[in-house]
């Protein structure tokens, strides 16, 4: 008997929750809790609070940048709409990995203006296209920053990053899977294009794909393109400062006292890479990757590295939850009035 879609989604979510639990367990089992609590007492909490405030600010800036991609389709899209969409997205992702993106798209489409025929100016397919171009752009920026870090600070980070990428690239299964996905997508697009004029389901599917293409091309129809790049630079500058704030918060602890702004930049990149693993809220994946990097580069024990990883990750989880709650209250009570 085949499972229905709801059951499959529940089982998929439970699987990734289990993965997160296992990752957290392996990270936490080596923690010296007496040392951990002592570190919390020595922590400069004003920097942690500053990092959380910067986290809320980056949601607003990201929302403004995404709004630039949406405006060619719906000029009425407001900053508060994209800000709320990002906040709700982050909060939903804490519970169900990747579901936040669906919530984000549904939110902006639901708040889109209507044309004279009563249809939404912004449709789901076009919104999805803008989300994809945003993700691709951020991925390219991350790769570019990692490459710059390797070139400029090879002695410190180069060997670790190259070794990590070499280990990833040596997996034949990964390359076969990637090639298979590309071939499948190409074949699917060719079939949809070939049968598009027959109407029915093929016409609808091709229409949806064409809408995604329109969303992807929204970059070329933006006004003030330079502002998009300014927003991007500001976003990553804020992320860097957030990482630096946690480094500064732990300066009174000997294991972290030598860390610099360059080290905070590396930890920011390492943390962004962990988001590829679709566990709820990044639990476990972030902790494991950051602790492993600290052990390899600075010989900081995993149990000690967990102090930084936990403080950085959980402070941002709290920020996401609070921002999501604030947007929910705004949407449910203030905006509807």
What are the language-model segments listed below?
Residues 87-102, 109-117, 216:
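Short intracellular "coupling" helices and adjacent cytoplasmic loop segments at the cytosolic face
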Residues 1-87, 152, 157-274, 315-337:
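Predominantly cytoplasmic-facing regulatory/coupling regions of multi-pass membrane proteins
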Residues 85-93, 129-141, 231, 307-316:
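Alpha-helical transmembrane segments of multi-pass membrane proteins
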Residues 91-97, 266-287:
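Transmembrane alpha-helix interface/packing and boundary motifs in multi-pass membrane proteins
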Residues 79-82, 99-101, 114-135, 300-311:
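Membrane-interface alpha-helices at helix entry/exit sites of multi-pass transporters
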Residues 54, 62, 66, 93-97, ...:
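Alpha-helical transmembrane segments and their lipid-water interface positions
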Residues 277-278, 289-337:
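C-terminal transmembrane helix pair
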Residues 101-112, 279-296:
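Re-entrant/interfacial helical elements at transmembrane boundaries that shape
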């Amino acid at each position: 008997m085949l499972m229905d879609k709801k059951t499959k989604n529940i089982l998929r979510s439970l699987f990734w929750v289990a993965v997160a639990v296992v990752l957290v367990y392996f990270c936490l089992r080596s923690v010296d809790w007496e040392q951990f609590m002592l570190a919390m007492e020595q922590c400069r909490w004003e920097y942690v609070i500053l990092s959380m405030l910067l986290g809320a600010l980056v949601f607003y800036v990201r929302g403004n940048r995404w709004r630039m991609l949406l405006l060619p389709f719906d000029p009425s899209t407001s900053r508060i709409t994209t800000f709320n969409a990002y906040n709700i997205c982050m909060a939903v992702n804490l519970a169900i990995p990747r579901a936040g993106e669906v919530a984000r798209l549904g939110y902006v489409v639901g708040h889109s203006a209507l044309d004279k025929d009563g249809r939404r100016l912004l449709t789901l397919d076009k919104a999805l296209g803008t989300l994809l171009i945003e993700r691709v752009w951020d991925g390219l920026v991350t790769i570019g920053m990692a490459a710059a870090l390797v070139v400029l600070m090879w002695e410190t980070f180069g060997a670790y990053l190259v070794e990590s990428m070499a280990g990833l690239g040596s997996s034949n299964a990964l390359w076969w899977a990637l090639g298979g996905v590309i071939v499948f997508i190409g074949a699917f697009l060719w079939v949809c294009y070939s049968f598009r004029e027959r109407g029915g389901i093929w016409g609808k599917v091709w229409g949806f794909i064409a809408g995604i293409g329109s969303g992807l091309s929204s970059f070329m129809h933006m006004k003030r393109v330079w502002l998009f790049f300014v927003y991007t630079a500001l976003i990553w500058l804020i992320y860097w400062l957030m990482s630096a704030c946690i480094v500064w918060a732990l300066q009174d602890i000997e294991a972290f006292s030598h860390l610099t702004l360059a080290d905070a930049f590396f930890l920011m990149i390492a943390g962004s890479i962990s988001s590829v693993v679709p566990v709820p809220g990044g639990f476990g994946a972030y902790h494991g990757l950051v602790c492993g990097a600290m052990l390899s580069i600075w010989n900081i024990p995993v149990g000690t590295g967990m102090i930084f990883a936990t403080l950085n990750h959980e402070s941002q989880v709290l920020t996401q939850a609070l921002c999501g709650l604030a947007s929910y209250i705004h949407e449910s009570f203030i905006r509807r009035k």
